[in-house]
Amino acid sequence: MKPGYHDIYTRYRDNITRGVLKPGDKVPAIRVLAEELKVARKTVETAYAILTGEGYLVSQGARGTRVNPDLLLPDNNAPAEQPTGTLPASLISQRERAGFLRPGIPALDSFPYKKWLLLAGQATRAMRQEEMLNPPVLGWYPLRQAIASYLNISRGLSCTAEQVLITSGYSGSLRLILDTLASRSDKVVFEDPGYFMGQQLLKRIVPRLHTVPVDRCGIDTDYLLRHHRDARFAIITPSHQSPLAVTLSLPRKQQLLDWANQNEAWIIEDDYDGEFHYTRKVLPSLKSLDQHDRVIFMGTFSKTIMPSLRMGYVVMPASTVGAFTDCADITTSGQPVLTQKILTAFLNEGHFFRHLKKMRALYQTRRDWMIAALREVYGDLFFTEQNDGGMHIVAFLTKGSCDREVARCWQEQQLQVNALSEWYRGSGKRYGLVMGYNNVRSYQEALELLERPKRQTLALLN
């Protein structure tokens, strides 16, 4: 029986993790391996794409494809390093490491690679000469139309294609919004805890950055009104807060909208994990409740499709389209038209909706595996709060505050979790591990992964 792409992927992954294939080793060319295994080239392409996406392989152009030279594999016989307090740097570099349980990574084994490759081929063959010039800074218009249609249907927005601006992702969107509308004297508030990479970016570009606590109902709007009523921008994740996974309550949504309208402030709504709710319908966005056009909505395709796509969007309030256009002309160079054409076809032909529906069911199953495995391996050392969706869980420590040390132990075992306390800037910290689960393929695999750092974890927490 001929191997499928998942069989090829599994063989290479296992050989790499066991050390049979070492960092820097060259792997066969796609054509050569396809001929040897007597399978279609697309089968090998798909397997290699998953391995590359997970960081096991790197493509080096004419030099071929190799096992990632920077791959860190666990050495179970090596003595554990002592914590050095440098976890924030490791959180940043984690995005480029291979490993498991990394938050925010979609299920790479379940993406419709063959369909995507087919659309890529069609888009490439259909490229016109004029599309090979500089891309439009606001984005390829058919993609802007497709995104507007998707947001109108699934997120309850009432927007036109003219209000949609295509960006390079989260950082590109946030930079462009602030470059367009903010001055250096403006006060900006951010959730605490809040998205770690967002914090790092804002600390570099916003002189007056302040935080507002988050509780079980989302960002504390009473605190915002007491301490930061004069803020010009509030950056929030109302649908699925990052990282605590709570949903902003309806009374607080209305309170936030009233504040923005009365003070001519802007709310930047980051639709973090907004597509992934498992036990109820996808919630309408905060923007859909906005009667005064004070909400700037932003999202990406990093979690719904793949991180390497580097494609995001901003829904501009109608009154700001001119300002955004002028700023984008100066500060951005547009996104590749070919990639935008592939994504447009993926949306317009219904593949995106079908993929999301499949992923919601799959992620709910994999989340349940991870929570059950965590309980079986660690008993009551961790606890989780049942939330309705998202792409990660927070395993809170039941005692102690050494989540940095625990996270470091797990990272040494190739488990790329985050320490929750690193996502806080103010007081009132909670302690635990932020972990992804989307690429855990079975309950048994979840158990095996969690067993890796068990000895060191028990030593720290008991």
Where are these regions (language model features)?
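Active-site PLP attachment segment
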Residues: 62, 288-323
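Conserved core of the PLP fold type I
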Residues: 130-263, 274-276, 281-289, 293, ...
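N-terminal basic, amphipathic alpha-helical segments
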Residues: 1-123, 319, 325, 329-336, ...
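Helix-loop "lid/cap" segments that line or gate small-molecule binding pockets
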Residues: 147, 313, 341-349
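Hydrophobic residues at beta-strand termini and immediately following loops
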Residues: 101, 167, 212, 298, ...
